């Protein structure tokens, strides 16, 4: 649990300012979608997989299964074949069908809004739920993925490895208006500059205020 003090808060303010200057304040998920259900399915598929790979699969997937009901009654083997280029496709196909069935039985075929309802769906954890809450419903939420975990620790915003604790730490110090876009901005920073091995600190626009800069 990180201590909230003046030094940390000053760093938070400057980091958020520079992220907005570098990437813009209107960033949203990289997963292509046209509605809440498509984003839900795409996010389930994105676990342990790149967004670009998911975006290659979803156009034909949603053409074959255009509605919640189509997924709910899908043959698992056929769905597996449709998503076989994505990792863990056996488990994901089962979860997607179960998710669609629960949406039909419990939520009238609509994607629910609350965290509690979202995580009750098969294949949906806090990360996926917060992607939906932020990008679809504009509910302030923080998505903790591998990039957010790594870079938030490097910036001194958290000292935990637990995604729930990291989420709580960030909620205490980040301005609420920044919660949704912080994740997307940090993902881009992590993919291009602040990589897991060999971060490019000399190229980073945060190097002068980052406690971990080399």
Question: Could you say what each language-model-derived stretch is?
Answer:
Residues 2-214:
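Catalytic cores of DNA base-excision repair glycosylases
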